[in-house]
Amino acid sequence: KSLIAESSVNLASLAASSVIALLPPLLLFALIQKHLVSGMASGAVKGIRAGTARKILDLFGAEALDIIENQPEKLTQIRGISPKRAQEIGESFRQQMGVRRLAQFLSEHQLPLSAAMPLYRRFGDLAVDMIAQSPYLLADRELDISFSQVDALAISLGVAGDDPQRVEAALMFELEHNADNGHVFLPRSKLVAATMELIGAGEETVEKALDNLCQRFAVVCRPIANVEGCYLRRMYESEVYVAARLAAACGDEWDCGRNVEQIIADIEKKQGVSYAPEQRRAVALAAEKGVVLLTGGPGTGKTTAVRGIVALFDRMGLDTVLLAPTGRAAQRMSQLCGKEAQTIHRCLGMSWNELTGEVTFRKNEKEPLEADAVIVDEMSMVDLELMASLLRSMRPGCRLVMVGDPDQLPSVGAGNVLGDLLRSGVIPAVSLTAVFRQAEKSAIIRNAHAVNRGLTPELRNTQSDFFFLCRRAPDRLVQTVVELCSQRLPEKMGIPAQQIQVLSPTRKGVCGTVNLNRALQ
């Protein structure tokens, strides 16, 4: 009885071995009965519900599992099961058994079961054999398995400490890990040193493994300034492509003559604004150049300039696409510009390849965007690979205007695209520096610029929109937050409590989000 009770765990391994043939017929029948009626009837196997499972069991008895897995065409003997459905049942059953065998293997080696389905989709029934032969296949950033776990598995399977596959996997892990932390490449000396420390291998062994990766073009090493930079192949190709496309776009120029000045004057009149000299130059530059950078801190009038560029492109008969890295930024861009904006990912048609774990985009060189001009806001959040994908989707001659604040944090992904383009001095750029009078009224904006200049922000003026309150006791802090949200801020700022957002650096504890939500609600 105890064995039967545990059959949901053990049946997969039994089916994969010759042990099942040695079981007494009654026990085997009980195992199959429990598996079919309780397990398969739950819907895990496509095409089988409780009634169908019992019919299969009644007809085939102890041979039911073998029939389903190896001779599913015999299931057509049961009324209601067509040849097509029989094949679907067999295929679904084989997949479920394969996933269970794989899950058992992962469980036995203390690896996350969440990796079972992605691995099965990628390698099918050969997954366990392939992992046993090449355990570092698991060192994949999409599988959420740490390198230390994979390495422990490999060592337990007999992989030697200086085995080339182990050293190469460690090198790739270091490059992937640093890419996740924002780095496009690593100096060769740092990469070798980090890998030696990670797996305890000698320098000569690591250098040889790195040379092997370079020969296979999995890693690309190129001289950069005074160091040899080591790139993941995709990072190197993205960087080279972005540089080449933008360099080519810098050569695109249009002679608009004095007509553009009149158009800008008309736009000012229609929008009820008067551009500062820097803003006017930005709008004019967008008319003349194939690629333009527009930068500035908060309150410097970037949005006003962008609205002018959009209106100018409309007057020129250009089909303009507005983009931003996030949904919130795209929504704000739409509201301020009076024209629909999209996220970059949505516009390019992002999809997820379950087999490779890679992000792909429908829009590319073969199927480019139907656009004459692209304006991208919040460029500081755009990483290198996303920038490369965007440029691949743009036809030659399509104008590009990049807008952002270089003093914001760089992108989460690898690369500091906006900052690097500004420092290159190659892209035509306009930097808005003057803070407009209306924006100067905001202490938030004044303090942002103060921090950029290395000055201490003003913190004590509780009549402003930026102030600091100190509370020593956690309970008192929660009480203050509730007072601010329910009384002081709504009365002072005229903001409904429902439109106030409270942020906390922790989830647990008196001042964590869980307790704050309870108190606020």
Give the predicted meaning of each segment.
Residues K1-L26, A30:
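Interhelical loop and adjacent transmembrane-helix boundary motif
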Residues K34-G47:
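Short cytosolic juxtamembrane segments of multi-pass membrane proteins
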Residues I48-E228, R245-A248, D252, A284, ...:
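Accessory alpha-helical DNA-binding modules that contact the DNA backbone or grooves
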Residues E204, V220-A373, L422, P428-R437, ...:
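ASCE P-loop NTPase motor cores of helicases and related translocases
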Residues V292-T295, V401, Q501:
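Short hydrophobic/aromatic beta-strand immediately N-terminal to the Walker A/P-loop
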Residues T356-D372, D383, L391-C398, A497:
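Short basic/glycine-enriched coil/helix segment immediately N-terminal to the Walker B
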Residues E378, G404:
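Walker B catalytic acidic pair
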Residues P406-Q521:
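Conserved helicase motor core of P-loop NTPases
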